[in-house]
Regions:
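Short coil/turn motif common to extracellular beta-sandwich-like domains
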Residues: 342-346, 433-434, 455-461
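C-terminal low-complexity, Ser/Thr- and acidic/Pro-rich disordered "stalk" regions positioned immediately N-terminal
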Residues: 505-548
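A cross-kingdom C-terminal cell-surface attachment/processing module
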Residues: 552-573
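Cell-envelope and extracellular/periplasmic
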Residues: 1-431
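Conserved N-terminal submotifs of small, disulfide-stabilized extracellular modules
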Residues: 432-455, 505-507
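Conserved "repeat-terminator" motif of extracellular CCP/Sushi domains
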Residues: 433-438, 486-509
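Surface-exposed interfaces of beta-sheet-rich extracellular modules
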Residues: 459-487
Length: 575
């Protein structure tokens, strides 16, 4: 765009140039780099969204393996008998073939470089792949291609580039830096510690990226979950430091369905950890795929659908854009309330991130109840009693806990209006009240706003408890403001059905752009039941963006990084 920048290379010939910001542009540009009379021209350079994709085999898994998956059946003919997703493979393949804008996509695959005494040898970088069709991507990550297609479409044909740095079978401790590894594994002589960090991340140089994709965990389900938690946070910190963005958004892929005797029962607990980490860490989001995956293939073929969900998550939380098209948008619905009347046989479940929920076709599976936490009884049927509430009856004398979709391989049963399944949960306590709490929820409420209804003639004592970091903001009963004395409100022999709404806000006040956090706990005689609030929106959600369709004239800085024949141009996020 007529820009001219100069800089000085270091003793190894490395340099970094920061260009003035440019809008996303699908028209190929020419970039010329010159030094000492020599000149190198890079043609057909696009300006758009760049992501870093890392992890193990399900991030590295190439399109070629997907295209020729018949070899799986040939190796084990019995495999095809229950391999339903194999039959669906053709439809996924058609989706890749039908995409007409491959010229908008760019892919860079980092080579694994050799090491000598833990020090990376110099190695030549790969070149960017500039595809004309799916046929040019045989050796490119299936996950990267699927995400790039979906994101480009949801952003109305903005160019998308993916930098892939992934190694099949790698464990998370291989991707963290040496200092973090020394803290987590003191005195451990494991030669794989930080191995991928040294030979798969450091050699890339400093690219500018909009966000990161992390598809990893299959090799760590056998290990200690607390160790994984520490390693993930170390990986997150180092990845953000490397890309010079302390709030870099990260999308993680929750392990989908898979069944193998060697890890039987381990995947559900690991999925719970992945969800917990996404909620603990700022600007980290997880894609739930509890209804995806293959029975006996650890490399599922339905990554196109998985990545559609990832792109829908990015659209809402990274770009802050509304979406009215078909397909996934936002995050998976989660159970935010479980209750029953004392002595009653009906249990109610309410969901967040859903305007309405649907039962899947056929017999519903996945939900089970217990009265003693020892033996869980499957719940065979459900009834929709509100836009985002379902109920069920059970023959158990009373229900104290529920768990949902706790399996290695099974059938998910509830979806929201965007086709996203309800996220699995393990041992959620069912609250018991002495009064009837209606399941019906008023429509048109803002995200997370819960309204609890109390039937006429009831007595109740409510305690409202804010989650950590939040303070009380307002209480209303049937739309009228009410006082909250010491966190409690007494309701005696109410003469009509009433709606009780309590709203909290972040301690110290909140921006007008933030959604109100709401009732963290509503209790009769029961103990505290903290509900998960909706994820705080990214700082990008309400900021200007340079992508097409956002209507912003703001120019953000662009960073250019050149390594051998590799080049990336990406929009730098505003702090």
């Amino acid at each position: 765009n007529g820009q001219l920048k100069t800089c000085t290379a270091d003793e190894y010939g490395r340099f970094l140039v920061e260009l003035d910001g440019m809008r996303a542009d699908a028209t190929g540009k020419t970039l010329t780099v010159s030094a000492g009379g020599a000149e190198k021209r890079f043609e057909n350079v696009l300006i758009g969204e760049v992501y870093y994709g890392s992890g193990q085999s399900n991030m590295a898994y190439p399109m070629d393996e997907f295209t020729y998956a018949e070899s799986v059946i040939e190796a084990d003919p019995s495999y095809g008998e229950d391999y339903e997703k194999y039959n669906a493979r053709e439809s996924y393949l058609e989706a890749f073939k039908d995409f007409k804008n491959y010229h908008l996509l760019r892919f860079y695959t980092q080579k694994m470089l050799p090491e000598t005494n833990g020090v990376v040898n110099k190695g030549e970088c790969n070149v960017w792949t500039v595809p004309a069709s799916v046929n040019d991507l045989k050796y490119t990550s299936l996950t990267a291609v699927a995400y790039a297609i979906q994101l480009s479409q949801k952003l109305e044909n903005v160019p998308v580039g993916i930098i892939v740095s992934a190694v099949g079978g790698s464990r998370i401790h291989e991707w963290i830096d040496e200092k973090a590894a020394a803290r987590i594994f003191p005195g451990n002589g494991d030669s794989t510690l930080s191995q991928r960090y040294r030979n798969m991340l450091l050699p890339m140089g400093s690219f500018t990226v909009r966000g990161a994709l992390w598809y990893q965990g299959e090799s760590d389900v056998y290990g200690d979950l607390e160790t994984y938690r520490l390693c993930f946070k170390a990986w997150l910190e180092e990845t953000r430091r490397f890309f010079k963005d302390e709030s870099l958004p990260v999308i993680t892929f929750q392990l989908p369905q898979y069944e193998d005797e060697s890890c039987k029962g381990l995947w559900p607990a690991f999925r719970q950890l992945q969800e917990k980490l996404a909620k603990e860490c700022e600007n980290v989001y997880y894609v739930c795929g509890i209804d995806l995956g293959d029975h006996r293939n650890i490399h599922p073929v339905d990554k196109y659908e998985f990545c559609e969900r990832a792109a829908g998550l990015a659209l809402k939380y990274i770009y802050g854009k509304e979406y009215s098209g078909e397909g996934s948008y936002g995050k998976n619905p989660e159970v935010c309330g479980l209750w029953r009347k004392k002595g009653g046989d009906t249990v109610y479940m309410r969901f967040s991130d859903a305007e309405k929920v649907f039962l899947s076709e056929g017999t519903a599976y996945g939900l089970s109840a217990t009265s003693n936490k020892q033996a869980y009884v499957a719940i065979p049927s459900y009834r929709s009693v509100g836009k985002r509430t379902v109920s069920f009856k059970t023959k158990l004398k009373y229900v104290s806990y529920l768990q949902e979709n706790v399996f290695d391989y099974g059938t998910a049963f509830l979806y929201n209006e965007f086709g996203l399944p309800v996220a699995p949960f393990v041992e959620r306590e069912v609250q018991t009240y002495d009064f009837d709490v209606s399941a019906e929820c008023a429509g048109g409420s803002v995200e997370g706003d819960e309204r609890f209804f109390l039937s006429a003639g009831s007595d109740a004592s409510f305690s409202f408890v804010p989650k950590d970091g939040y303070v009380f903001k307002s209480l209303s009963i049937n739309g009228a403001a009410a006082a909250l004395d010491g966190g409690r409100v007494e309701l005696k022999n109410v003469s009509e059905d009433i709606a009780v709404v309590c709203v909290f806000e972040k301690a110290g006040g909140m921006d007008s752009s933030d959604q109100s956090d709401v009732v963290s706990s509503v209790m009769g005689e029961s103990d505290k039941n903290s509900e998960d609030s909706s994820k705080e929106k990214s700082d990008l959600q309400n900021s200007d963006s340079c992508v097409k369709g956002c209507g912003s004239a703001l120019m953000l800085p662009v960073v250019l990084s050149v390594c051998a024949a590799g080049i990336a141009l990406g929009q730098k996020r505003r702090k």
